[in-house]
């Protein structure tokens, strides 16, 4: 990750921590990584149920964030989820995933690796990052 992206990466992690809706991830390792980052929001794992059921559960929340992996499969899952959620009144956030992918795709392939990357970023002693650690 380029040094100029460190601050934005940490801002996105803070956004995840403060998120109050439902986060949709692919599996248990993704959920564990997010919990390690301090995320307290409801986390729904795709590995447990069909997409239509996931969408129905997620639709009960005012806001839903899709946080699938950054590979082709994750991209396809995100698109399918967006289409399943279109008929529901919840707000769907895919921008956070897109921005994380843009910033971190050279370093990680998916959500389960976010915590490791976070630890690397906060270990960098940069005065501009003060207050984010």
Swiss-Prot record:
Pfam families named among the record's database cross-references: Toprim
Cofactor: how bound: Binds two Mg(2+) per subunit.
Co-factor requirement: Mg(2+)
Protein name from the UniProt record: UPF0292 protein TGAM_1777
Ranges for domain Toprim: 20-100
Organism: Thermococcus gammatolerans (strain DSM 15229 / JCM 11827 / EJ3)
MF terms (GO), sorted A to Z: metal ion binding
Annotated Mg(2+) 1 binding sites: 26, 69
Residue intervals passing through the bilayer: none
InterPro entries (UniProt xref): TOPRIM_dom, TOPRIM_RNase_M5-like, UPF0292
Keywords, sorted A to Z: Magnesium, Metal-binding
Family per record: Belongs to the UPF0292 family.
Keyword Metal-binding recorded: yes
The organism's place on the tree of life at top rank: Archaea
Binding residues for Mg(2+) 2: 69, 71
